[in-house]
Amino acid sequence: MEDLQLVLFILGAIAIVAVLVHGFWSIRRQQPKSLKDSPMGNFYKQQADKESPPKRVDADGFDADGIGAVRVRKVGESNSHETPPISPYLKQDVKAEPKPLFKHTTSTEIKQEPVPQPDFSLQSPLATEQQRGAKVSRQEPVLNGHVPPLGQSHAAMVAQKALEQEKHAQSTTVPTQTALFDEDAYLENTESEDEYVEETVDEGLDEPRDVLVLHVVAKEGQQLNGAELLPCFLTLNFKYGDMNIFHRHVDNAGNGKVLFSIANMLKPGVFDPDNMEQFSTQGVVFFMTLPCYGDALMNFSIMLNSARQLADDIDAVVLDGQRQPWGEFTKQDYLHRIRANA
């Protein structure tokens, strides 16, 4: 038994040594041979020496391209007193160009006499008045002052508030300037100034004469939750603004004139965006004043589509200004009112 163990121990040692030798041999075989050990290294070197013939140099040590042998110099050796050799091929007659002669002239100081300022203004009184008038802020009309009765809705109350703000903005007076010219000179320039004013000043709208109202109300036994209304308002490009309600502007980003608005159907008719999750209502009111900015028919079409889209999103119903189901007869009546106030 001991002899068998000894034999197995010797065979295992021989196997381990064989594996190590084979591993070292495999690693050495996979390593790339250097150019010095390669038998073809000298062959390529000899072929390169045969193909490149020795360059011919002249007596000064320059070849046909004017290049001389490389010279090795010590560090710090001065080259100021040495003149580098010049190739005979580069020795050419170079004519020195004459330096341009400039005649220096003495600059004389130029004194500018002060220009007398006129004692009067060339700006006409009409232009001055228009420029000052442009600075006066004017709030755009949002609602109509004469709101038809809408039952229990608060569109009339919101419209009345907007009308009061509009009258307050229009009551601002603009100071006028005393004319500096005589009356004849003023009348001669009036025609040209009127043309300029028409091009630069936007025409204001007349006072609201009518308001178009649409209701989006919850179905019987249900309510509209603020958590659902707020994302729908934002998706329809409404922006929270004046009077604490949402407005649809000319620009989808919320800039420009107001086209139409949304108010709460219940008192006091406002929204609180910070507490919309706890908010609930029976319905909301879409309203648009006439006349309005832009194309009234297009604006009403956008308002109607927005009301229908909101009703589809929150499972509600679209009603007219009298809280009656929206139909073709009501649509034709609204179109007639739009044409009458266009």
UniProtKB/Swiss-Prot annotation:
Compositionally biased region (Basic and acidic residues): 47-57
Primary location: membrane
InterPro entries in alphabetical order: Cell_div_ZipA, ZipA_FtsZ-bd_C, ZipA_FtsZ-bd_C_sf
One GO location term (cellular component): plasma membrane
Subunit structure of this chain's protein: Interacts with FtsZ via their C-terminal domains.
Cross-referenced PANTHER family: CELL DIVISION PROTEIN ZIPA (PTHR38685:SF1)
Protein name (database record): Cell division protein ZipA
Organism: Shewanella putrefaciens (strain CN-32 / ATCC BAA-453)
